Amino acid sequence: MKKIILIVMFLASTLSFTSPTWIEYLIKVDNPQNAAKIVAATDKFMSSEFVKNNFKGSLHLNAYVAGGKVEETHSFALLQPSLAEHEIWLAKVSDPNNEEVRKFGSVLNANSEGVGSRINVFIQTYGTPSNKDTVWAIYPFRTKASNVEDIVEATEDLNEAIKDSFPGQFGLSERMAGGGMQTHLYTVGYESLAEMEQWEDSASRD
């Protein structure tokens, strides 16, 4: 795992990071002013009655601070119970007569450029899900299907070894689409950059 992608979470709509399916929508935002408009519009949209009554899962708006591609500066991560549930949600937001969707879409389109999307499915998560974890390190990698069982077992062993000292949460996911050569990834959450650096320093000494 040579590559690390570091992101900071701007906004979270709910507390859950345990949904088995999570979809990333990647966007490019040119400046902080446009980013602020997107944050405000997202917050308003996720607080609407339409979302409260129809969206099952959670949404997280993230900013890339290191390791991302030039084309992407931010991403929306939608965590939902299944791909089927996500398809239901997509059908609802595709209604051209939905005013809440139209308002949100107009702000998003005026202040960002769509880059792509990725579909991921959690294999296993570890630690306690918390929206206090706003700094996320992502470690994508490629492996053969025949290696996955051994990787899961090694991850379980790692969790047992660090569960009493590791301050954050982490998960192992399979990348189903949009990842190019990548097949899997680890996501590791911390409350702050300082917490991440402190853990990395202590782990390297152990």
Question: For each predicted feature, which ranges?
Answer:
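Short S/T/G/P-rich N-terminal loop/turn motif that feeds into the first structured element of a domain
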Residues: 17-206
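Sec-dependent N-terminal signal peptides
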Residues: 4-14
